[in-house]
């Protein structure tokens, strides 16, 4: 992988374990070190988006807890205190260098709704054009488990795709991806570069992670899958390594680089369908139609739909299934489940299709085969 001199927009994700002291509280020294590195990139002309964990870690002791709580209400209460404290610290440190930081708290529903998804992107672009440093975190105080991103690794990857970033840098307490767990296996070897996340690469992830954060190595690989599919480079390295950010964007850092080679990246619409939309139902397709959809050769017409499962509206994203029940793709439908199921409604659509050859159920431009 050679240095990319055209790189401009970088998303940096840092986890709780890289921001806290041995006692689990936010370390100002570590925050200062991170801010100094972000400032160095800003001074060099880069746009930087920071996805920062640490709200719960910053707040739980203020509630009288001795260690990080496990129950959701206690974690959310901790985050409600800690997020403000964390942003106050970031703002002061960036202002000392002449930069303004903004806070963006996101929930998964902000990404699953396409209108809100586009609105978040537009807001971030304005901030970046004005030289602001957006600091992003999941809105832990109001998010319930079933609607969470899971961890900030996933959030960072989706943010990178949202704003067409050139690179995602994930800073952790481990200096890259190994072929085993380096904490328990001294013979484990670091993998310098990954061009495809294969089952063998996934097997290397194990369950390595820290007790302070929520994201282990497996979640990081899932994040890099997203950015690689979106045509974005990735890097995983150790947060406390000297000048890690500057060296990472110049392809000179110690860690693991991720880059998809020889694949066509997903466009914005395809990214939203694949990673954010949240399918609402299923359509079982004929064998001939399934084959064409899998090969990206055709839109989905009425005669290719054999069965409908679930309820959905026109404009919803649904799963496209073959006759064996295997998911073969996702698509935005032009008709509701009611229109496609009720005899009178379906007859009306059939008559329309006989007149209008473009009366497709799902256009090829708004469908995505699952590989």
Swiss-Prot record:
Transmembrane regions: none
Domain of life: Bacteria
Gene3D superfamilies, alphabetized: Acetylglutamate kinase-like, PUA domain
Known EC number: 2.7.2.11
SUPFAM superfamilies reported for this sequence: Carbamate kinase-like, PUA domain-like
Biological role stated in the UniProt entry: Catalyzes the transfer of a phosphate group to glutamate to form L-glutamate 5-phosphate.
Protein name: Glutamate 5-kinase 2
Recorded name of the encoding gene: proJ
């Amino acid at each position: 992988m050679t240095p990319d001199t055209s790189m401009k927009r970088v998303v940096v994700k840092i986890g709780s374990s890289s921001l806290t002291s041995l006692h689990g509280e936010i370390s100002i020294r570590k925050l200062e070190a991170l801010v100094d590195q972000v400032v160095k990139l800003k001074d060099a002309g880069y746009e930087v988006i920071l996805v920062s964990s640490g709200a719960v870690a910053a707040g739980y002791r203020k509630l009288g807890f001795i260690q990080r709580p496990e129950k959701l209400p206690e974690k959310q209460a901790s985050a409600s205190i800690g997020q403000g404290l964390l942003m106050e610290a970031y703002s002061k440190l960036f202002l000392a260098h002449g930069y303004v930081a903004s806070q963006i708290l996101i929930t998964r529903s902000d990404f699953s709704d396409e209108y809100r998804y586009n609105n978040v992107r537009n807001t971030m672009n304005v901030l970046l054009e004005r030289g602001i440093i957006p600091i992003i975190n999941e809105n832990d105080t109001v998010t319930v488990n079933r609607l969470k991103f899971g961890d900030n690794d996933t959030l960072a990857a989706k943010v990178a795709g949202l704003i067409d970033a050139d690179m995602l840098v994930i800073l952790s307490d481990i200096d890259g991806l190994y072929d085993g767990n380096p904490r328990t296996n001294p013979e484990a070897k670091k993998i310098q570069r990954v061009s495809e996340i294969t089952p063998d690469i996934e097997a290397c992830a194990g369950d390595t992670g820290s007790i302070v954060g929520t994201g282990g190595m497996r979640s990081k690989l899932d994040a890099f899958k997203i950015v690689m599919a979106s045509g974005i480079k990735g890097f995983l390295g150790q947060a406390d390594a000297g000048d890690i950010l500057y060296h990472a964007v110049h392809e000179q850092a110690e860690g693991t680089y991720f880059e998809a080679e020889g694949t066509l990246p997903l466009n914005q619409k395809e990214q939203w369908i694949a990673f954010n939309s949240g399918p609402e139902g299923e359509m079982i397709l004929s064998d001939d139609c399934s084959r064409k959809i899998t090969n990206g050769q055709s839109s989905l017409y009425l005669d290719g739909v054999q069965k409908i499962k679930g309820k959905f509206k026109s404009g919803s994203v649904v799963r496209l299934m073959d006759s064996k029940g295997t998911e073969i793709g996702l698509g935005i439908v032009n008709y509701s489940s009611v229109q496609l199921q009720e005899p009178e409604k379906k007859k009306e659509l059939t008559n329309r299709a006989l007149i209008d050859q473009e009366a497709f159920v799902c256009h090829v431009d708004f469908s995505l085969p699952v590989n």
